[in-house]
Amino acid sequence: MNVLIFGPNGSGKGTQGSLVKDRYNLAHIESGAIFRNHIKQGTELGQKAKAYIDQGELVPDDITIPMVLEVLKNEGKDGWLLDGFPRNLTQAKKLWEALQEEGINLDCVIEIQLDRQEAKDRIMGRRLCENDPNHPNNVAIDAIKPDGDTCRVCGGALKSRSDDQDEDAIDKRHDIYYDTQNGTLAAAYFFKDLARQGKTRYIELDGARDIQTIKNDLLNQL
């Protein structure tokens, strides 16, 4: 099974993506990790990508698409979950064209939907336990809301990540994601149109619900 997953930062996309990956034994392919690996290995594409990243610019699609395809064909030959790409409509169209040319099926596209303000509240509400950062604590989610400044799992002290409190950075990321004309949602809707044509499946999930309910809904639809 080959799967694309969309969802704004704060929607629980990582949690549900991990569920799908583990349940179907898929390779988890994340665009940021692809760049880091190529740069670390000093590949030609990695060197080209680094030149743009060092200047604070987006890596062009003619570099990104070949990187993604290479990983899909090698690491994902038995099935993959692609996360973090495409980020805009142009990339979505180019990715689809490349998949068609390579004869790679896209079996399913998952979109986790969440109101922009709620997504922002969840990001800013995240708290890290000093004993184990994997303990779920979020002051904006009732199901995992901590008791004051102590971890709801172990009682350890909690702190917030500085980047989770950077409203400007959060807003910029969400500006890209929630752009329905050219941004990430436009990319998701491109695949939704393909699903209407019978070329893939498109699963929409209400991300405002609790994790277990979303999980059950997702597994039922898959």
Could you describe each region identified by the protein language model?
Residues 1-222:
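Glycine-rich phosphate-binding loop of ATP-dependent small-molecule kinases
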